[in-house]
């Protein structure tokens, strides 16, 4: 059969690509060699974080948080979307200085990131072990459960018209005239 777009890979990027293209009215086929989210996309930490990003990525991640909230509302399951924040610990004063420098970028984008002293880290994370001189915390950062979220997004893509084919490895691409 024919498709406007064939997406190879059923991880979070492939599934979201198929979803947004299907919602835009494209005829989409997604091919996954195993099962949806069966590789790295089911094994990552699921962070949807602004903290520590390259300054040019911060607006993209702010938009990503909005998109993830909207997607969570469309699913039929709890994808574990939480806004619990992200904390990076500093073990040296040099790391703290790096976090202070990054904080200037965060302020320019109105993020809620803040520096933590060693006591502030212990207050925020009372069970933390090991030594640290402080850290940085961004309360608005989010997390989803990837092994639940990606299949749920694939279901939304299928409802939007994407055809999702699992256990279908792509071994080669035949192209003619650049297509």
Predicted regions located by residue number:
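A short, glycine/Asx- and small/polar-enriched loop/turn
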Residues: 94, 125-133, 174-179
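Glycine-rich FAD pyrophosphate-binding loop
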Residues: 22-42
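Dinucleotide-binding Rossmann-like beta1-alpha1 core, especially the glycine-rich loop
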Residues: 45-124
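Helical element adjacent to the flavin cofactor pocket in flavoenzyme catalytic cores
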Residues: 136-179
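Beta1/beta-strand and adjacent pyrophosphate-binding region of the FAD-binding site
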Residues: 1-13, 29
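Conserved dinucleotide-binding and phosphotransfer motif residues
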Residues: 24, 109, 160
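Gly/Ala-rich phosphate-binding loop of Rossmann-like dinucleotide-binding domains
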Residues: 18, 22, 156
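Short loop/edge segments at beta-strand edges and connector loops
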Residues: 32, 117-118, 166-168
């Amino acid at each position: 059969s024919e498709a406007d777009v064939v997406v190879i890979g059923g991880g979070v990027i492939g599934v979201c690509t198929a979803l947004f293209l299907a919602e835009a009215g494209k005829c989409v086929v997604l091919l996954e060699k195993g099962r949806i989210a069966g590789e790295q996309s089911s094994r990552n930490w699921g962070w949807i974080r602004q903290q520590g990003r390259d300054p040019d990525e911060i607006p993209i991640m702010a938009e990503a948080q909005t998109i993830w909230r909207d997607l969570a509302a469309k699913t039929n399951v709890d994808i574990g979307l939480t806004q619990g924040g992200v904390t990076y610990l500093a073990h040296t004063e040099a790391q703290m200085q790096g976090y202070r420098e990054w904080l200037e970028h965060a302020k320019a984008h109105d993020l809620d990131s803040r520096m933590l002293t060693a006591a502030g880290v212990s207050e925020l994370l009372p069970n933390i072990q090991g030594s640290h001189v402080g850290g940085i915390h961004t309360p608005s950062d989010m997390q989803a459960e990837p092994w639940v979220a990606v299949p749920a997004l694939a279901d939304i893509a299928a409802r939007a018209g994407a055809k999702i084919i699992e256990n279908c490895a792509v071994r080669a691409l035949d192209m003619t005239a650049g297509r």
